[in-house]
Structure formats: structure tokens, C-alpha cells
């Protein structure tokens, strides 16, 4: 006789969260006192530590809420414009679970002036359709100009071109960096799910996930787990949710070395250019 009371595996283990450094906060001097409830008394080096048990509870709450939004046919928008890694991560996630995304600079009024945004989206969709239907009738120059305009619009609106109405939920990797998006969502009472580091004002976020949003492995794990809620609600395979630790493999990008500027060489080049300019003037 099979055991019908077998418990579902945990969403993600605390060991995996710790391994991915999801609980490493920012340096103490950057902390927001309103995040104090989520912070451990001790620190690691000079960084605050976030409470893993509270992080896990918050993650599960947000996960279940996202599932409910999807099951009720709500639209979800992922936002991440902070750096190249986050942009690529958000694009990959959004395409995996088929939701809208914004990875370019947040344009003021994206939510609060959605009618204007819709005009740009409609223009993009019409131009794409026009290029498909009239590709053979356009001259080479006309086709080039049309492609450039589509590329320009695609850059800013490509991720939201299927968004027919305001989203029912916004998922953000860094509410401090994406403050304008958070404030617009707040003004329209659109719920916000966000990874909140120790420098965040949690009062601006509806579903707070106290977490390290400054390191790639942490951001990758947590944002993908939130996307897995969408995948589960749609009947897709999850990437990380409910998987054993050994199946969760996250590639950590190498740190980019800082370029050291040799100021003496810079001065020499500048002086050489000045000498060349003087010589040119003397020959005139």
C-alpha cells in the first residue's frame, strides 16, 4: 500500500540558499533600520547577515502568491536593468516562462501612463507586421530604415510588446535601483515582489524577500525560483524549485578585473597630441 501522506520536498534547502550566499547583506553603514527585523545580530566580516529562516518563509509566500496570480490569468512583469548580468538573467527567465520583461532604462510613465506605452507597443507590432507582408515590395533603403526603427522600438518595448493591459504583479531584483518602477506600481496599487537587501525600505514592497541581490549566484537562484512559480502554475517543468541540491548548478561569472589607468602614459599621449596640434598650426 502506497503512502499517500508523503510530504512534498521543500522548495529549496537552507543549505543551498547559504551556499549561494543569499543571506549576505550589505556593509553595515548602508543598512536601512527598517530591515532590522530580517537581520541577524552577528555579522560576517563587515557585512550584515540576513535570517535564512525568514528568507525561506518569505520566498514560499511570494512563490504561492505568484502561482495564484497566474492561475487567475493575471499578467506578470519582470524588471531588471541594473547591469548586463541582471538584464540577461531577466530576459532568459521571462522567455522561459513566457512573461513580459523590461531590461532597458525604466521610462517614466511606463505604468502610470500606460496608454502612451500602448501606442509605442502598437507601433512596434504594426511595423513588424508591415515588414513581414511588404518585404518584397520595399526598396533596399526603405527596408533598412524600417529595420532600424523596429530595432529602436524593440530595444525599449520588445519585452512588453505582448502586454495588452497593466500587469497584475511586478517582480524586481533590486527595489532600490528600480525605485521608479516601485513607486509607479505603488501609486497604482500593483503588488511588488522584490529581493530586498539590507539597504531597502521594505515599506515600498508588498512581498519582501530579504536577500542578497548584489551577487550573481544569489540573484540567479532566487529570481529563477520566483519564475518557477509561474512555470508550476502553467504546468511547465521547474528549473530549481523542489529540486535536490545536487541538481541545482549555477555558473558564477568571473569577476571582471578593474582596468588600471597609467596616468603618466595618459599625460604623455595628451602632450604628444598638443605638440602635433602646435606643429599643424605652425605650418598653416
Curated annotation (Swiss-Prot):
* InterPro entries noted in UniProt: Ribosomal_uS2, Ribosomal_uS2_bac/mit/plastid, Ribosomal_uS2_CS, Ribosomal_uS2_flav_dom_sf
The UniProt keyword set, sorted, is:
Ribonucleoprotein, Ribosomal protein
* MF GO annotations: structural constituent of ribosome
- Entry keyword Ribonucleoprotein: yes
Q: Which Pfam families does the record associate with it? A: Ribosomal_S2
Q: Which Gene3D superfamilies does UniProt cross-reference here?
A: Glucose-6-phosphate isomerase like protein, domain 1, Helix hairpin bin
One biological process term in Gene Ontology: translation
Q: Does the keyword section mention Ribonucleoprotein?
A: yes
Q: Which GO terms describe its cellular component?
A: cytosolic small ribosomal subunit
| Homology family | Belongs to the universal ribosomal protein uS2 family.
Q: Which PANTHER family does the record match to this protein?
A: 30S RIBOSOMAL PROTEIN S2 PROKARYOTIC AND ORGANELLAR, SMALL RIBOSOMAL SUBUNIT PROTEIN US2M
- What this protein is called in its record is Small ribosomal subunit protein uS2
Question: Which organism is this protein's natural source?
Answer: Mycoplasma genitalium (strain ATCC 33530 / DSM 19775 / NCTC 10195 / G37) (Mycoplasmoides genitalium)
* Taxonomy of the source species: Bacteria, Bacillati, Mycoplasmatota, Mycoplasmoidales, Mycoplasmoidaceae
What is the gene called?
rpsB
